[in-house]
Swiss-Prot record:
Zn(2+) binds at residues 187, 249, 267. The gene is aroB. The keyword Lyase applies. Binds 1 divalent metal cation per subunit. Can use either Co(2+) or Zn(2+). It comes from Cereibacter sphaeroides (strain ATCC 17023 / DSM 158 / JCM 6121 / CCUG 31486 / LMG 2827 / NBRC 12203 / NCIMB 8253 / ATH 2.4.1.). Its EC number is 4.2.3.4. It catalyses: 7-phospho-2-dehydro-3-deoxy-D-arabino-heptonate = 3-dehydroquinate + phosphate. This is 3-dehydroquinate synthase. The keyword Metal-binding applies.
């Protein structure tokens, strides 16, 4: 299999997302052209370090690149002030200079945190994303959104800071636990839902074999990245079209906050549930036929994924409390909730005027089924 390259066109800050097998083994040769001195600082997590850090550092060493690494605890709880401060202090102790490169080796948590650290360190150093989860490869590693969570909500502190290169090694996805792979699929299916009905139709057929079929997996990652790159190139800082990428996320972020950013609900699982709720909301508002949310739920069920609020273990707050959590979402404009709704599969759009009582009733009905 060959390596695919998708270019994110952002003028002088354009970069490539390289997708294919064996990219970690070739990481030194891939990263070397970016370096002004043969040294990088790697931020990773303890789980990824045990699987991929040694091969990655060996690949760098073979290209004559020295490296140091800090492994943070794995999990969403790491994406907050304490570990962020620890990472920045460590980068300063490592004497990372403005012309150097920081490497984010891991999933979305590490990519977001390391990218934000790179954005603020010495007012901005370059960084390379080496995403090791399906979710990070198709979504969080591309587009320059970086940040951390706070007590008030998810991703409320951060910066737009584009990577200089993304290396998406699809081979490492074979080491993912099945639940993590399925969670990442929540972001893959989102792309078909928001703007490519043909891709969604292909996923209905190919989705169940992605974990075992490297060629299908690479196609799914490539098409997802192509769609994100196109949208980011048009709207880097989310003033317009880029908001479409938040399909399912208004519900998702509230549910993640309600479950304490814990193992009860992974981000991609929340996205899948959020997409199902967004399509159900669209149907209730008369925007799409009932067939669309029913078809989506059937596909997610066939993939073994969480689909409804009843699939989340443990207690959940009331519909009113979930609405209050949504009001903290960073997509709120002039105090109004923004939802990504759909007129059908592949036909998403941004809506600023969704009646709160319709959302409340939707949530009440979903909670009543638990």
């Amino acid at each position: 299999m060959t390596v695919d390259a998708v270019r994110v066109e952002l003028g002088a800050r354009a970069y490539e997302v390289r997708i294919g097998p064996g990219l970690i083994a070739r990481a030194g040769a891939e990263i070397a052209p970016l370096l002004r001195r043969p040294k990088v600082a790697i931020l990773t997590d303890e789980t990824v370090a045990g699987l991929h850090l040694d091969p990655f550092r060996q690949a760098l060493a073979e290209a004559g690149i020295a490296s140091s690494a800090l492994a943070l605890p794995a999990g969403e709880a790491t994406k907050g002030w304490p570990q962020f401060a620890r990472a920045v202090e460590w980068l300063l102790e490592e004497k990372v200079e403005r012309r150097d490169v920081v490497v984010a080796l891991g999933g979305g948590v590490i990519g977001d945190l390391a990218g934000f650290a790179a954005a603020v360190l010495r007012r901005g150093v370059r960084f390379v994303q080496v995403p090791t989860t399906l979710l990070a490869q198709v979504d969080s590693s591309v587009g320059g959104k970086t940040g951390i969570n706070t007590a008030q909500g998810k991703n409320l502190v951060g910066a737009f800071h584009q990577p200089s290169l993304v290396l998406a090694d699809i081979g490492v996805l074979e080491t993912l636990p099945p639940r993590d792979f399925r969670a990442g699929y929540g972001e893959v299916v989102k792309y078909g839902l928001l703007g490519d009905a043909d891709f969604y139709e292909w996923l209905e057929e190919a989705g169940p074999r992605l974990a075992a079929d490297a060629e299908a997996r690479q196609r799914a990652v490539r098409r997802s990245v192509e769609m994100k790159a196109e949208i980011v190139a048009r709207d880097e800082t989310e003033e317009g079209d880029r908001a479409l990428l938040n399909l399912g996320h208004t519900f998702c972020h509230a549910l993640e906050k309600a479950t304490g950013y814990s193992g009860r609900l992974l981000h991609g699982e929340g996205v899948a549930i959020g997409c199902a709720l967004a399509f159900e909301l669209s149907q209730r508002l008369g925007l799409c036929a009932q067939e669309a949310p029913s078809r989506l739920r059937a596909h997610l069920r066939a993939m073994g994924m969480k689909v409804d609020l009843r699939d989340i273990p443990g207690d959940l707050p009331s519909a009113e409390a979930l609405l209050a959590l949504m009001a903290q979402d960073k997509k709120v404009v002039d105090g109004k909730l923004r939802f990504i709704l759909a007129r059908g599969i592949g036909q998403a759009f941004v809506a600023d005027d969704v009646p709160g009582d319709v959302v409340r009733t939707l949530l009440e009905d979903a909670l009543a089924q638990r």
